[in-house]
């Protein structure tokens, strides 16, 4: 075994101090065999003796064992090295158990290479030795090394345990290695440990991280024993894969079984509520959080702050933020992002200043929110200032999000040529989000030349995204380029591009209702459509006129109007007007960008019904009130 590079030291002195520091020994200890054992251990440093003289002192080995465990808990690498040297000098290099504890101590201290040296020098290894090394590599995010040593373990004929497989599965989860996951699943089935609590939980967690949610569900449902961690992992898996409704249903199922709730489960459920704009259920979850004692937990608080902001309740979001005593950078970024999404620049700037006064240094996420709010509110010079500030003052390199925001800021201000020049100066290949920002601005200013440049790039980067074709067709329509519209439609058909089906959600009486374009499955759809017909007549008196020029189906105008009335956000709005009290705002979430016609419809609805309407689409929040929208008709 390799000896650690360490000078000879008085192990008695540092061991006593170390044990006192770790609260194993009292500061005044007159008795205890432990003190005697320290003296025995130290005596080896004081005189040259043969190890056999102390062969009866078994407690000496136990003391080294105990000190190493304390080293692991406290990250004390110097003490661990001293014990390593003592192990070599008193000829305990063949003690597998002691060496396993030494490997673990080096591991917990962050000294991976030293741990590997001890492992490689072992004359004999146990299952614990292999498991400790696999766990070490997994904790240090060294996935390849974890898989390699597992393969080495199998090649040497060692039988693995449930702990081995669960650790290797955790390693695969970092890079979402689906192939390795399948192999390990087969291996666990072959060795009859696939239904083990820890293996099953690790398997479903990995499948979910790899986007294989059906496989994760299959593993979950096949497990006879499930812990709170298992349930939490499955709920989180649904949320990671954007199956938010399924996450809420599973959580309710767990509640009926009176399972213990932890902060990770609660955060996942809160996240599901925020992405469904399910404010009522979100409030209920917040109450559960406070009752469970997690209200002051900064991790959970960040989820609650985000939920209220995404549901359009900024007041509640800020109250929760204010109540957290120890705020971290994530929490600051969450509240700043919340106000930015609602286009509240004044509050964003104030929070940014307070954040710095609190000793927090802004990061890339912070500047994404700052640039975003500048784009939503037309603050061109402020946007330029922040873009420069992040580089010169904070040494942050702008990423895709920052460049996309800057293109959006310039484009919204009509500075399309400058936005295009910025894109050409980007030190990496511009992404779809960057070209998409330029194309959206071209629609507003009817700039056909740059629109075609941006669209061509988008067709290359996102050949299956029908939204880009639709947006270009809208620009052609605005410029009365009917022949180009026909070509665009033909290209759309020839490429067999599938448009993402529009969906909208609305939370009514503790239940999330989902509407798709052309909805027919909702139990009250006939009543909704009848009410919609009557409302359209009413809204026309307030200036609403169907924007048939943006409906690209090659049909008669009457049919185009009919198709526009089938949009999911209109159906969700009508259902909300039917079911919610007149004093309640209507909150809707949409999975796509709200179309021009629906935007005009919402404006007319807010004026005709005197209701406050909030629509959260894929890009931003729209607050409709008295015939106006917070976006200023630019989105």
Swiss-Prot record:
Positions of region (Type DYW motif): 541-635
Keywords associated with the record: Mitochondrion, Repeat, Transit peptide
Gene Ontology biological process terms, A to Z: RNA modification
One of the record's GO molecular function terms: zinc ion binding
Residue windows of the PPR repeats: 60-94, 95-125, 126-160, 161-195, 196-226, 227-261, 262-296, 297-327, 328-362, 363-393, 399-429
Presequence boundaries: 1-38
GO cellular component: mitochondrion
Region (Type E motif): 434-509
Subcellular location: Mitochondrion
PROSITE patterns named among the record's database cross-references: PPR
UniProt-annotated stretches for the region Type E(+) motif: 510-540
Taxonomy, superkingdom: Eukaryota
Family (UniProt): Belongs to the PPR family. PCMP-H subfamily.
Protein name, UniProt field: Pentatricopeptide repeat-containing protein At5g04780, mitochondrial
Organism expressing this protein natively: Arabidopsis thaliana (Mouse-ear cress)
Lineage, top ranks: Eukaryota, Viridiplantae, Streptophyta, Embryophyta, Tracheophyta
